[in-house]
Amino acid sequence: MFNKSNALMVFSTLIFSAALSAQDYTYDPQRSAVLLVDPYNEFLSEGGLLYPISKETLDANNAIANMKDLVNAARASGMKVIYVPHHHYREGDYDGWKFGGGSGCVFKAGTWNVEYHPDLQKQPGDLEARQHWKSSGFANTDLDFLLKLHGIDHVILAGMRANTCIESTARYAVELGYHTTLLTDAIGAFNMREMQAAVEIDYPVIGHNVLSTRELIAAIE
């Protein structure tokens, strides 16, 4: 006989057992990488088309500073930082797509908007995957190849947007066999409801670890 209370208890156990605390896990820099997803001016800088609707969550999370601290700590430990960029739109890119592509209004090729935020520029030794067309950094890119080439089997996700590209890339990572860590405060979204749904409901189900930036840095230092 179905018992709602028991079902909720089991579901809660599954959710919260999926994510470990920082004290339970450490990260080998030679086997781990930070995946920095879409750190574009379009999202992160005043003047970006998506900045006005991202600003609330970016400010609430202190997200840009946390992303910067994360990649700096990763580099200092010898861990790879891999940029995972969204496709740069050119006129005609989506012509003939059976179910449509994007609006073509954002991420325009050759513009300041698709440059990386000034505090999150690539550094020598960083890697960059091929651009993803939709949400997942793995679909139709070389990200899986880059990770395997460098012997990496643990990925840590940060960047934009919490409930789309971050979440989709994390789901693919888990399906492909990577130990996957999601961060609660090195991300942004278009509003707090999106952020809360991602962090409180989806991430604990998807990820092996769900940590704050401080917890993650402590686990790699």
Regions found by a protein language model. Give the residues of each.
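Active-site-adjacent betaalpha module
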Residues: 2, 22-33, 68-77, 99-221
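N-terminal signal peptide c-region/cleavage motif recognized by signal peptidases
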Residues: 17-18
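Acidic/histidine-rich helix-loop elements
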Residues: 44-60
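N-terminal post-signal-peptidase region of extra-cytosolic proteins
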Residues: 56-66, 70
